[in-house]
């Protein structure tokens, strides 16, 4: 048996063990254990299906090779072997991709944060446009989007939007969106038809629990104040808005979308934990960068990753030199897979 076949056999064995464990009374009565084992089984389900098929093809190849000695069946066996060898090769390619080490955060939900950068009102308008594209993409993927916090500007755009996106494989696909997105287009208010360039930043932060990020309460500075509306007018007569600052890192989160101070504090704390976890990921990636090829998806907010040129209907993905002349269609349909799939393929190729 080859090394690959042995590896796949052990994966199948573990999958069968998990199936048995998940139907045992002991595990069913332990929610934590049940969730843990279910996640493990789910993580190897795809590779298990491919493994079963691959091992079956190997068995068929072995049988047909034996039939080559039979004069009556040798020609039929030769034809069958051609088909089987092609199938074996295709399965090996797919299995190698499935065996690439998984990012431990790939199955997590995310906090998506979009912030207007240079370019004034135009940047704020593009925050709204790109957020709509992400929402359409989420619809295509059957993900759930919940706006956690938003700050509008005076022309119908946004200074900032933070949303929680839940669903299968959210982080695995959207992690490549982190960075600076540049937009080039003629603003509606531009009478001379001049193209303006503006930029926004996108952050992708995995949703984390208390076990993954533990915060010492003494490291937090919590301030409460009255929520303000547009132009600074007061929209709440009580001190319901909350600002939490993590003193060791000086990372700060403000929240005023809810009328309840308790709810604002809870939301702010969750986002703070996500930002601290994002910082951990960035530091780990920097430490690992010296030991491996540079990978797409560093998550650095300052890295200019993409340009959206509306006059040319062009989307340029700078990290992999990808150019698509279907910008408007992608933005309106939300079919970001046209950009994300090549990014994933490039990231996977770094392991080969």
Curated annotation (Swiss-Prot):
Coiled-coil intervals, chain numbering: none
Pfam families reported in the protein's UniProt record: PCRF, RF-1
UniProt keyword annotation of Nucleotide-binding present: no
Keywords per UniProt: Cytoplasm, Methylation, Protein biosynthesis
Annotated Gene Ontology cellular component terms: cytoplasm
Post-translational modification comment from the UniProt entry: Methylated by PrmC. Methylation increases the termination efficiency of RF1.
MF terms (GO), sorted A to Z: translation release factor activity, codon specific
Subcellular location: Cytoplasm
Residues with PTM N5-methylglutamine: 233
Region ranges (Disordered): 288-309
Gene3D superfamilies: 3.30.160.20, 3.30.70.1660, 6.10.140.1950
Keyword Protein biosynthesis: yes
Extent of Basic and acidic residues compositional bias: 289-306
Described function: Peptide chain release factor 1 directs the termination of translation in response to the peptide chain termination codons UAG and UAA.
Similarity comment text for this entry: Belongs to the prokaryotic/mitochondrial release factor family.
Annotated NCBIfam families: prfA (TIGR00019), PRK00591.1 (NF001859)
PANTHER family reported in the protein's UniProt record: LD18447P (PTHR43804:SF7)
Full protein name: Peptide chain release factor 1
Species whose genome carries this gene: Helicobacter pylori (strain G27)
């Amino acid at each position: 048996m080859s090394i690959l076949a042995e590896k796949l056999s052990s994966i199948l064995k573990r999958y069968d063990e998990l199936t048995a464990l998940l139907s045992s009374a002991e595990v069913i009565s332990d929610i934590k254990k049940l969730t843990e084992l279910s996640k493990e089984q789910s993580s190897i389900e795809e590779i298990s299906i491919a493994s079963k098929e691959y091992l079956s093809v190997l068995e068929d190849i072995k049988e047909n090779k034996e039939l080559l000695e039979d004069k009556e069946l040798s020609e039929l066996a030769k034809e069958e072997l051609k088909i089987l060898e092609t199938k074996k090769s295709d399965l090996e390619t797919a299995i190698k991709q499935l065996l690439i080490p998984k990012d431990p955060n790939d199955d997590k939900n995310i906090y998506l944060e979009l912030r207007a950068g240079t370019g004034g009102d135009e940047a704020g308008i593009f925050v709204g446009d790109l957020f709509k594209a992400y929402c359409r993409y989420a619809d295509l993927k059957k993900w759930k989007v919940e706006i956690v916090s938003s700050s509008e500007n005076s022309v119908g755009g946004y200074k900032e939007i933070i949303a929680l996106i839940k669903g299968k494989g959210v982080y695995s696909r959207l992690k490549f969106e982190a960075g600076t997105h540049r937009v080039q287009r003629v603003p509606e208010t531009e009478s001379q038809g001049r193209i303006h360039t503006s930029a926004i930043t996108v952050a992708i932060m995995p949703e984390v629990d208390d076990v993954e990020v533990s915060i010492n309460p003494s490291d937090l500075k919590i301030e409460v104040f009255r929520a303000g509306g547009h132009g600074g007018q007061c929209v709440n007569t009580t001190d319901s808005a909350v600002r939490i600052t993590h003193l060791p890192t000086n990372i700060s989160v403000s929240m005023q979308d809810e009328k309840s101070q308790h709810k604002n504090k809870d939301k702010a704390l969750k986002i703070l934990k996500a930002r601290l976890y994002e910082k951990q990921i960035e530091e780990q990636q920097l430490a690992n960068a010296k030991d491996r090829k540079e990978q797409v998806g560093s998550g650095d907010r300052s890295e200019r990753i993409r340009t959206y040129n509306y006059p040319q209907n062009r989307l340029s993905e700078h990290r992999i030199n990808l150019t698509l002349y279907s910008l408007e269609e992608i933005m309106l349909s939300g079919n970001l897979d046209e950009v994300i799939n090549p990014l994933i393929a490039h990231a996977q190729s770094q392991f080969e």
